[in-house]
């Protein structure tokens, strides 16, 4: 019997910096203990046209922070007339998480975006922050890293990064019981945020 204290979980997420943008990818499964609770969970969240975060961990905690970050980004733009930078968003998130460390949010985040260039940060539940060229988080991260470590190059184009990100998530899905039920892929370039449709994703993977 499930206990009410068990948490709804999100699992494997991946981020890749390419020469022309950032790719974020995630599986769509959420589990409650050992039970698959949902099969179409959104784990990548648009903050504005050039910023997004991907979360692995407690779904409620992630969505709460997404709402706060969207509000802060809008307020920053209203007050300054400028978009928040990727680093500023990641630092804000890190400060929120560090401030709650006595009763922590149960989530690990990837913050990706494009300001002067594509950038990617990982932020852990204690507020530790690192800028990365590629990163994986969640229960299937070790399987995703086996792909990222062997396939990543700094001169990757977004189209190539999409294929590697999908391969990394698929590796996790095949081996991690808490990952599965499809893949969501988002790109963030100078032109802005774009979520790939299933048909578009399939077309890219066939090339």
UniProtKB/Swiss-Prot annotation:
Activity regulation statement: The formation of the proteasomal ATPase PAN-20S proteasome complex, via the docking of the C-termini of PAN into the intersubunit pockets in the alpha-rings, triggers opening of the gate for substrate entry. Interconversion between the open-gate and close-gate conformations leads to a dynamic regulation of the 20S proteasome proteolysis activity.
SUPFAM superfamilies: N-terminal nucleophile aminohydrolases (Ntn hydrolases) (SSF56235)
Positions annotated as active site in the UniProt record: 11
EC numbers on record: 3.4.25.1
UniProt keyword annotation of Hydrolase present: yes
Propeptide: 1-10
Record GO biological process: proteasomal protein catabolic process
Major site of localization recorded for this protein: cytoplasm
GO cellular-component term (any): cytoplasm
HAMAP family listed in its UniProt record: Proteasome_B_A (MF_02113_A)
Protein family per UniProt: Belongs to the peptidase T1B family.
Protein name: Proteasome subunit beta 2
């Amino acid at each position: 019997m499930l206990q009410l204290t068990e948490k709804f979980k999100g699992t494997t997420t991946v981020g890749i910096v390419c020469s022309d943008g950032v790719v974020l990818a995630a599986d769509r499964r959420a589990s409650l203990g050992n039970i698959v609770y949902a099969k179409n969970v959104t784990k990548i969240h648009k903050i504005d046209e050039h910023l997004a975060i991907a979360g692995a961990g407690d779904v409620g905690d992630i969505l709460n922070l997404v709402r706060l970050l969207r509000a802060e980004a809008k307020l920053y733009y209203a007050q300054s007339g400028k978009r928040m930078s990727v680093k500023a968003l990641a630092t804000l998130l890190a400060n929120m998480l560090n401030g709650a460390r006595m009763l922590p949010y149960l989530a690990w985040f990837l913050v990706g975006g494009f300001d002067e260039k594509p950038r990617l940060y990982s932020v852990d539940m204690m507020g530790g922050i690192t800028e990365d060229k590629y990163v994986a988080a969640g229960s299937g991260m070790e399987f995703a890293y086996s792909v990222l470590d062997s396939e990543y190059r700094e001169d990757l184009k977004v189209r190539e990064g999409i294929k590697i990100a999908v391969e990394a998530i698929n590796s996790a899905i095949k081996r991690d019981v808490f990952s599965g039920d499809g893949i969501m892929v988002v790109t963030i370039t100078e032109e802005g945020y774009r979520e790939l449709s299933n048909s578009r994703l399939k077309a890219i993977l066939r090339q």
